[in-house]
């Protein structure tokens, strides 16, 4: 079962275009799915509801900023298994667990595996709205960071092997003259490699490029 809201114009308090504005709800309780969808859509949050894990996993779009409200106990594939499958794919989807039988070990496990929150059923509607809004904010940040990382990785992929060697040395703080000796090339060639690195990556300076890499969590090993 899937429930999808209609497209709505932007209103004050709703996510702007390009922001995270979708919540997946995965719970085998049909009525709970519907009630949560109505709650979220009452504040203009798009919702897609699923009553089984396979349907969700087939519909999940890893390139769309969203968050997931996930029941722990379901027939077949349970909530923790869904979380494991998402983690295995390096998904940046924030997960909010819900359970009618929650306990401390269960909530600790969920959070240790990357969930952003854990709510017990029946949950307070306002608390759920607050948690989901926070999850959508987190989703927007995570997807923006991933997009920036992919952009930097694509630019680095354009470098030749020798340009990569040069960049690794620069990242390590090695002076150009020492780079020339280590790589067995002339200082002029090192300067040419540095210039081509800037040109291919669109960076004003190598320092700016290295700064972008650090912000994206990329180091020498990823060059």
Task: Name every feature range the model reports, one short phrase each.
Residues 33, 75, 99, 103:
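The feature encodes the CheY-like receiver
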Residues 49-67:
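Acidic, metal-coordinating helix/loop segments flanking the phosphotransfer/catalytic sites
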Residues 51-52, 75-84:
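Acidic catalytic/metal-coordinating carboxylates
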Residues 103-105, 119, 123-132, 178, ...:
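C-terminal output helix
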Residues 198-223:
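Basic, Lys/Arg-enriched C-terminal extension of HTH/homeodomain DNA-binding domains
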